[in-house]
Amino acid sequence: MKLNKKQIIKIQKNRDPYLLIDYATKIIPGKSVEGYKILKKNEWFFKVHWPGDPNMPGMLQVESMIQMSSLIVFTLPNMNGKTLYLVDCNNLKFFKKIVPGDKLKIVSKLISNNRCLYNFESAGQIKKKIACKATFTLVLPGSLYINPGK
């Protein structure tokens, strides 16, 4: 399965300028996804992060991986248009600056699904070199109570 930006907008709730993925080239619902974010010179965050040395903020790199990963769930039956919240992020690493003109390839896989908790591994690549990676958990809001601990 493939999705262009218009199709992505139909199945998930993020919108420009916060929609941080452009298209998915390969989706296996409930399993994995590959897709891209094209970093244009006029992206809103390049103006402020950092003047003279523009690069994609790390948390927006994470958000791109989350948005791409969510397509694995949103392409499942009866999941179109739902919302997923980030509840955990681990093993977060940044290896390379992502700059204007880069083509960020995002590869994600669903590693486990326990009720409404979805655990993912994801990596962003620039020219076949890993730029960022993380494991994280997304949850359907209201589906279960997350106890913050004591």
Q: Each PLM stretch: what is its role?
A:
Residues M1-K2, S69-V107, A131-P141:
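Hydrophobic beta-strand-centered segment that forms part of the acyl-chain substrate-binding groove
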Residues M1-T25, T137-L138, N147:
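Flexible, low-complexity linker/boundary loops enriched in proline and small hydrophobic residues
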Residues I9, G52, F94-K96:
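Beta-strand-rich interaction surfaces with strong enrichment in secreted/lumenal proteins
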Residues R15-M56:
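Catalytic strand-loop segment that frames the active site of acyl-thioester-processing enzymes
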Residues I21-T25, L86-V87, L110:
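A structural signal for short, hydrophobic beta-strand segments that form beta-sheets
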Residues D22-Y23, N90-L92, E121-S122:
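Hydrophobic/aromatic beta-strand elements that line small-molecule binding cavities or substrate pockets
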Residues A24, M56-N80:
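Active-site helix/loop of acyl-thioester processing domains in fatty-acid/polyketide metabolism
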Residues G30, I98-K105, K109-K150:
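HotDog/MaoC-like acyl-thioester-processing domains
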